Design a protein with these regions (language model features):
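N-terminal secretory signal peptides that target proteins for export/translocation
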Residues: 1-2
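N-terminal post-signal-peptidase region of extra-cytosolic proteins
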Residues: 47-61
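Sequence context surrounding c-type heme c attachment/ligation sites in exported
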Residues: 21-39, 61-185
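Sec-dependent N-terminal signal peptides
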Residues: 5-14
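N-terminal signal peptide c-region/cleavage motif recognized by signal peptidases
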Residues: 15-19
Length: 185
């Protein structure tokens, strides 16, 4: 009977197009290898990038499909899990990463209790998004503003240590210096 239940579970996962392995040990690499959309990056762990992109680019919002990956900065990731997995987070799992030239290491992952390196609880911010945006924050989605300008975000994205180096503009360099507390002289 146990074998039968195991086989049924495997069959259900395969028929639903959900790969449990994709969620168990997700691999997060260079943010710029993902698909850019209005200043953030998207992907899909299950290969359904077109469905993820359709929601991300929609002017009306929508519900992201399972496997959707969203990143604004290299060290923070949201992954959409299968429907019903975590109703309190709208099925989003939050990740805090340590990134280096060698790759990514998951520092923290979870649902309601993930706190980023600046002390902010991921869910506390994302749950403020208007319902049609499926907990994804942008400037006009209902979330509290983050203390980073678009220029700062772009500079942070360009300096992801997992990526091939790209030149920074003088403005981007000044933005990074301002972030690190430098005078920008």
């Amino acid at each position: 009977m146990k074998l039968r239940n195991l086989l049924l579970t495997c069959l259900l996962l395969v028929s639903a197009g959900v790969s449990a392995d994709a969620f168990e040990e997700p691999v997060f690499s260079c943010i710029r290898d993902m698909t850019p959309v209005r200043g953030f990056y998207i992907d899909n762990l299950l290969g359904d990038l077109e469905a993820t992109k359709a929601v991300a680019e929609s002017e009306e919002g929508g519900t992201y499909p399972p496997g959707s990956v969203i990143q604004l900065v290299p060290t923070e990731v949201m992954v959409k899990r299968e429907k019903g997995f975590s109703p309190d987070t709208n099925d989003w799992e939050f990740f805090e990463l340590n990134v280096s030239e060698q790759g990514s290491e998951i520092s923290t992952r979870g649902f309601e209790d993930v706190v980023n390196r600046f002390g902010g609880n991921c869910l506390d911010c994302h749950e403020k998004a208007d319902p049609q945006w499926d907990m994804v924050c942008e400037q006009n989605h209902g979330c509290d503003p983050i203390p980073l300008s678009a220029l700062m975000v772009r500079a942070i994205q360009k300096t992801d240590p997992r990526c091939e180096a790209v030149p920074l503009s003088d403005e981007e360099m000044a933005a990074l210096q301002a972030l690190s507390g430098g005078a920008g002289e």
